[in-house]
Amino acid sequence: MASEVLAKPQMRGLLARRLRIHMVGAFLISLGVAALYKFGVAEPRKKAYADFYKNYSPEKDFEEMKKAGVFRSIK
């Protein structure tokens, strides 16, 4: 058996290198989730509110609630 000299393992900077890689990954994932939320939830919600209030009439809504008897003090 020939005895071979094993290379010394790297012992310095392992945690720093691993954290650097994982921080970059976490940052990219968080950007992706933020973009998905913005374009998948926030923008459609904003559009739905804009469409609703484009044709909304508070007077008409008030009259419908008045006819339904929601307000006791108004006759």
Swiss-Prot record:
Ranges in the topological domain labelled Mitochondrial intermembrane: 55-75
Membrane topology according to the record: Single-pass membrane protein
Gene3D superfamilies found in the cross-reference section: Mitochondrial cytochrome c oxidase subunit VIc/VIIs (4.10.93.10)
Mitochondrial matrix-side positions: 1-13
Residue ranges of the TM segments: 14-54
UniProt keyword terms in alphabetical order: Membrane, Mitochondrion, Mitochondrion inner membrane, Transmembrane, Transmembrane helix
Top-rank taxon, per record: Eukaryota
One Gene Ontology cellular component: mitochondrial inner membrane
GO terms under biological process: oxidative phosphorylation
Coiled coil residues, start to end: none
The keyword Mitochondrion is annotated on this UniProt entry: yes
Cellular localisation: Mitochondrion inner membrane
Database matches in SUPFAM superfamilies: Mitochondrial cytochrome c oxidase subunit VIc
Pfam family, one: COX6C
Pathway participation: Energy metabolism; oxidative phosphorylation
Main localisation: mitochondrion
Oligomer status and interactors: Component of the cytochrome c oxidase (complex IV, CIV), a multisubunit enzyme composed of 14 subunits. The complex is composed of a catalytic core of 3 subunits MT-CO1, MT-CO2 and MT-CO3, encoded in the mitochondrial DNA, and 11 supernumerary subunits COX4I, COX5A, COX5B, COX6A, COX6B, COX6C, COX7A, COX7B, COX7C, COX8 and NDUFA4, which are encoded in the nuclear genome.
PANTHER family the UniProt entry points to: CYTOCHROME C OXIDASE SUBUNIT 6C
Family statement drawn from the similarity comment of this UniProt entry: Belongs to the cytochrome c oxidase subunit 6c family.
Annotated protein name in UniProt: Cytochrome c oxidase subunit 6C
